[in-house]
């Protein structure tokens, strides 16, 4: 460290050494300052003015800063950009410090570990995820620090990892340094960690410490060896960043893929579950469903959508709860109560991390006071799931009483501002406050005594945070100030003084205020520790309130959107009567055209033809969305639905170049198709909307034919296969399990009219030129296209006729077919040659 640096800069550099990969916010008075490369980076990311302070190696030291009172806004912007920040505060007293004020890092904020309410999206989980690969296994562990959830999963394929990342959308990824990562990981904030953190024995030790056990066998860890190493690395990172215990992480959830309806990354995007094709949050399935009353419910609903269940029994308990809520007309009253509840899940995490603010505790208290009313509202609902929820929504009278006596009704935002602990809670604090609060009365008394003693009519006693207490005299009377008045400050029209008596009073009052703040901070920290004993009950309460919110929301959606309860059965098949698209229907001004669908083991594929914009993709997507909604326990947009067992939903709908990994549209299309053909089973729902478009017509048709045939006859998956290759409509003649259906359209007064009805049979034309006209293609181009189309159709007609008119059979060929060459003698062979020659001559004469 350069000796030429000032003591303050030496202190900065010493602290910065421990946080090389983070932006160090170094508190200096009313600002957080950044220096050197941190300053340059922050100025770019936050659009700050880059200035300089002092020199290093004969060059000015770059500096940038942000006001401490506005720091949360700047932190939020940095976290969204994937940056991590170390907050370095002044912990020493500037008045007593001989050198630089003592400072230390008091808080580390990273994208995946942030729990501050102001820095989080209330309706999204904030996930920290670690990846470890070993022996062709991919282990992942993720934690939602704000929700107290800790999950493990073992994967075998990269596409499974991609699906999980798309579903979870982690704010931060941890992986072992020098580990090659798939290209799709570049969409996330990746932190490379030292190799020793990814160690099996270290992971076992950290996990045992976290869960206070000597053995992990109760968690089933033997089946998750790779994921456990990732979990250990994740805990090591949390230990570094949080610098304290994590009492709200009490168990591991082991994800098992066989429990869920699998949705790969492409399917999640194609079905627009969480965002539309443009990346926005509107006009997607979640936007239609999410009418939840609280943030906890919103986050849980998104988790349900991302992980649809396979087990019919669990789904049916959700259905029964929703039916009861509808029957008892409880949705409105319950939502009004839940809307008043705080985000208990995240408040609990802040209590566990000792970062809960006073208003968090007031919000928690308000929620506790609502529990009896919510519990009473649920009394008539006898469904199994609601009965379980009722058990967790029981009042917590001791905690409620503690909060009522400890915190005032409307506290300031921060404990450092004081005035948080309620009067009567602590006798010592009350005494210190009384001393401070009586200061005004004492000040008035002192002022009157000095006026009487000195006879100075303009004499006033005052106080400000800079000068402290003072006696003020006008300029005219200042010359008459008595000797015990010691001048403190000279202003334009007045002089200010201090007296020994006033100084003694000042020390006493300021000492009382300082002691009161210190006492209040100590009491508040103890209060948080006392509340921590209720973390298990509060965590269960948060889960139950969230679950109740989602069930009430699904009940409201079912009634508002005219959805019905699907029937889940053990027999194979998919039957939908009058199905509608859950996202498009609510957005339409006119009536949505409903359509039926039936797939069963011996008739498992629909080959769908019809014009572009005719509704093929809508029909396919609505089928998948109805199936997905049924598997989260929701009612569905259809008159009647019966579903047998299903394991996955696959989609191959639309495609575009994947420039980041250098893949063309056709390559993307083929990759998605390959995954379907390799992974689909007879219990999978497969949606394929056009394949083979990115190559030559014949290659494309061949690929479409082979894929269609393989899905129908070999895999036997439930398949909706749309195509513009009308030649494929001959497939039902070859495979009885395939049915032709088409979307109707007609031409009226020269314009195409889409009817959006699904009918049996195949389309007789594609209406491509009519759709092109709707799109605004110039008339001269359309005219040329029509002429060229007629030429092509005429040529194809001639070719077909040529193929159909078979030439007459040749007598020579007929005779040759009768012969077995291996049995002819030399004489017979010679006679045959003469005979064939004779036949050939006779044929030429004819």
UniProtKB/Swiss-Prot annotation:
Q: Which UniProt keywords apply?
A: ATP-binding, DNA damage, DNA repair, DNA-binding, Nucleotide-binding
Q: Name one GO cellular component term.
A: cytosol
| Gene3D superfamilies xrefs | 1.10.1420.10, 6.10.140.430, DNA repair protein MutS, domain I, MutS, connector domain, P-loop containing nucleotide triphosphate hydrolases
Does the record bear Membrane in its keywords?
no
Binding annotation for ATP = 610-617
NCBIfam families per the UniProt record, alphabetical: mutS1 (TIGR01070), PRK05399.1 (NF003810)
Q: What is this protein called?
A: DNA mismatch repair protein MutS
Give the organism the record lists: Legionella pneumophila subsp. pneumophila (strain Philadelphia 1 / ATCC 33152 / DSM 7513)
Q: What is the lineage of its organism?
A: Bacteria, Pseudomonadati, Pseudomonadota, Gammaproteobacteria, Legionellales
């Amino acid at each position: 460290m350069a000796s030429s640096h000032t003591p303050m800069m030496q202190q900065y550099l010493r602290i910065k050494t421990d946080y090389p990969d983070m932006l160090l916010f170094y508190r200096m008075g009313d600002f957080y300052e950044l220096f050197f490369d941190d300053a340059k980076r922050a100025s770019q990311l936050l659009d700050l003015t880059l200035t300089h302070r002092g020199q290093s190696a004969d060059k000015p030291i770059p500096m940038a800063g942000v006001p401490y009172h506005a720091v949360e806004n700047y932190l939020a912007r940095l976290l969204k950009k994937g940056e991590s920040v170390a907050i370095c505060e002044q912990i020493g007293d500037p008045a007593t410090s001989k050198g630089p004020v003592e400072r230390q890092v008091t808080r580390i904020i990273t994208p995946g570990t942030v729990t501050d309410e102001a820095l989080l999206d209330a309706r999204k989980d904030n996930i920290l995820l670690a990846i470890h690969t070993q022996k062709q296994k991919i282990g992942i562990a993720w934690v939602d620090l704000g929700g107290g959830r800790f999950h493990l999963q073992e994967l075998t394929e990269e596409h499974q990892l991609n699906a999980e990342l798309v579903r979870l959308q982690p704010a931060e990824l941890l992986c072992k340094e020098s580990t090659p990562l798939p290209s799709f990981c570049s969409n996330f904030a990746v932190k490379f960690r030292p190799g020793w953190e990814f160690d099996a024995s270290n992971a076992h030790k950290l996990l045992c410490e976290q869960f206070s056990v000597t053995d992990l066998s109760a968690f089933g860890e033997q089946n998750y060896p790779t994921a456990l190493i990732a979990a250990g690395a994740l805990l090591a990172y949390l230990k570094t960043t949080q610098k304290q215990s994590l009492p709200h992480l009490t168990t591991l959830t082991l994800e098992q893929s066989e429990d869920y309806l699998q949705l790969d990354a492409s399917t999640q995007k194609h079905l627009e579950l969480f965002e539309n094709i443009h990346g926005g949050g509107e006009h997607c399935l979640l936007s239609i469903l999410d009418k939840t009353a609280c943030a906890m419910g919103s986050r849980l609903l998104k988790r349900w959508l991302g992980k649809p269940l396979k087990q019919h029994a669990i789904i049916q308990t959700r259905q029964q709860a929703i039916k009861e809520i509808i029957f008892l007309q409880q949705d409105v009253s319950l939502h009004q109560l839940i809307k008043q509840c705080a985000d208990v899940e995240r408040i609990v995490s802040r209590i566990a991390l000792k970062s809960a603010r006073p208003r968090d505790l007031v919000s928690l208290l308000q929620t506790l006071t609502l529990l009896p009313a919510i519990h009473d509202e649920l009394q008539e609902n006898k469904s199994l799931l609601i009965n379980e929820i009722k058990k967790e929504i029981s009042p917590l009278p001791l905690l409620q009483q503690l909060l009522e006596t400890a915190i005032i009704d409307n506290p300031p935002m921060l404990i450092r501002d004081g005035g948080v602990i309620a009067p009567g809670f602590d006798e010592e604090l009350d005494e210190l406050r009384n001393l401070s609060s009586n200061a005004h009365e004492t000040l008035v008394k002192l002022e009157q005594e000095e006026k009487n003693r000195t006879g100075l009519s303009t004499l006033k006693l005052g106080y400000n945070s800079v000068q402290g207490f003072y006696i003020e005299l006008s300029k005219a009377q200042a010359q008459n100030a008595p000797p015990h008045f010691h001048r403190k400050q000279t202003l334009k029209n007045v002089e200010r003084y201090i007296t020994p008596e006033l100084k003694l009073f000042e020390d006493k009052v300021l000492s009382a205020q300082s002691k009161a703040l210190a006492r209040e901070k100590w009491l508040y920290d103890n209060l948080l520790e006392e509340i921590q004993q209720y973390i298990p009950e509060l965590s269960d309460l948060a889960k139950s309130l969230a679950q109740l919110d989602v069930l009430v929301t699904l009940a409201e959606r079912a009634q508002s959107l005219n959805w019905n309860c699907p029937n889940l059965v053990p027999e194979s098949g998919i039957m939908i009567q009058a199905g509608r698209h859950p996202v498009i229907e609510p957005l339409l001004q006119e009536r949505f055209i409903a359509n039926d669908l039936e797939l069963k083991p011996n008739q498992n594929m629909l080959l769908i033809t019809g014009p572009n914009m005719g509704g093929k993709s809508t029909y396919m997507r609505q089928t998948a969305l109805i199936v997905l909604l049924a598997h989260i326990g929701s009612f569905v947009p259809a008159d009647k639905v019966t579903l047998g067992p299903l394991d996955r939903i696959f989609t191959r709908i639309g495609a575009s170049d994947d420039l980041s990994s250098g893949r063309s549209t056709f390559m993307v299309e083929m990759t998605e198709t390959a995954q379907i053909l390799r992974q689909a089973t007879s219990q999978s729902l497969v949606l394929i909307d056009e394949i083979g478009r990115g190559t030559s017509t014949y290659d494309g048709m061949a690929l479409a034919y082979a894929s269609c045939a393989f899905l129908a006859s070999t895999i036997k998956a439930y398949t909706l296969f749309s195509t513009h290759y009308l030649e494929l409509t001959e497939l039902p003649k070859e495979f009885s399990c395939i049915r032709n259906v088409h979307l109707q359209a007609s031409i009226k007064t020269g314009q195409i009219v889409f009817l959006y009805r699904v009918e049996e049979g195949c389309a007789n034309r594609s209406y491509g030129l009519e759709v092109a006209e709707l799109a605004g293609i110039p008339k001269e181009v359309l005219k040329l296209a029509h002429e060229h189309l007629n030429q092509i159709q005429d040529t194809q007609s001639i070719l077909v006729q040529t193929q159909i008119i078979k030439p007459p059979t040749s007598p020579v060929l007929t005779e040759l077919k009768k012969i077995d060459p291996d049995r002819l003698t030399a004489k017979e062979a010679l006679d045959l040659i003469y005979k064939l020659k004779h036949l050939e001559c006779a044929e030429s004469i004819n």
